[in-house]
Amino acid sequence: VVSGIRVDAERLIDLADFSDASPRAIAGEVARLVNGGDLGAGDRLPTVRELAAAIGVSPATISQAWQALARAGLIESRGRAGSFVRGAASARLAPRMRGMAAPDDPVRLDLSRGTPDPLLLPALGPALSRVSAKAETGSYQAEPVIPQLARVLRDSWPSDAEAIMVVDGALDAISRTLEQVVRFGDRVVVESPGFPPFLDLLEVLGTVPVPVRLDEHGMRPESLAAALRKRPVAVLLQPRAQNPTGASMTPARAEALARTIEAAERVDDLVVIEDDHSGLISIEGDVTLGTWLPDRVVHVRSFSKSHGPDLRIAALGGPRDLIEHIAGRRMLGPGWTSRMLQTILLDLLVDGTAINTVTEARRQYYTRQRTLGDALRSRGVAAVPADGINLWMPVLGERSALVQLAAAGIRVAAGTPFLAASDATDAANGMRQRAGGDFVRVTVGAVRAAADEVADDLASAATHLVAGGY
């Protein structure tokens, strides 16, 4: 297909099946052509009036279809110049993050981003007014972690970590730990589905991901045991509110995974890296394999979802030697996380009003999860009960669901970027049973009201295919 050509209405009708002339079906047919390569990036689509006349529908019908495609990120409007098939996402984003990047087009309800509800975050104003007299900004020699924050972190840590440091967010912690643990060509056990930036990071580091399947309690011990036979150097997992499934480990599951690692052969140097990204908004208790494997576990606690993504702050705890290696390497870069930010976080962690705000946020997210999840299940969608702000929703067809929801003014995240290599390949090749079927991620934490109406749209998209299977 030659990109950048003008596709007239006659050509589009030859390529597509517009026997169902509803906005949703028309959008689905054009989506199929884009994803199949029949329409290329930069191709100019027929005008609304031209295609409406050719098909025999009203211009409003085509306009609604075009709007749905734009919301799904497949086409873009350039004003009087017309509507065009979108090009590739910016190269500044890694491959799977490009797959998750949402277009800038406004939608009625954006459930794609996996971010906390801003209205549930503690106010920073009072903390800022209090810390101005306490924060230290004039020293290169002070301790990298302010002592008061170190004590608060240690008192609440889920295991007896030998050392704890503060870094610039959970992904910074994961990246710095992996850089100390893995070498090019090493194997790393990952969850599938899992967090797309982890998979991008492993690709950048030249490692080989070994996917492990999940259930409602996280990694399955028998699947982990099979993965360990490939002699990985690290296991990367999310103990609570797993992104995207919302699964949280029970203490029994954590112990079973730890015993599985203990029993495995030829993995004596294996390191477990835990990303507790939801932290204080998770309804489940803090849990770590470090309770049973203290010398082999690095535990990360993020404060982004509980206290604000722009604070860019997380804590990292584990064996002293490894933490000191990470801290030493960091001194050759940023050195430390701003002590001003650390002081703000400390204030938020001990202030009664901020504590109550986070407690209420945790309750609200639990209520939103339960309300929307129950509504979906009552409508025939087999959504597994989840923790945190995300829900992994099974659908008959990923692209079809995205287009249908876009037509309803709702944006969700496509499921494919969350799959590790072999599972993603299976999904792309249509081997849905082996890959576990099609899914989309829904940020239910953003559903403040009208859960039944949202559930109606989600369930319809999950249980129906538009024309052509898209």
Regions found by a protein language model. Give the residues of each.
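Conserved glycine-rich beta-strand-loop-beta hairpin in the small C-terminal domain of fold type I
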Residues: R362-G373, V381-V395
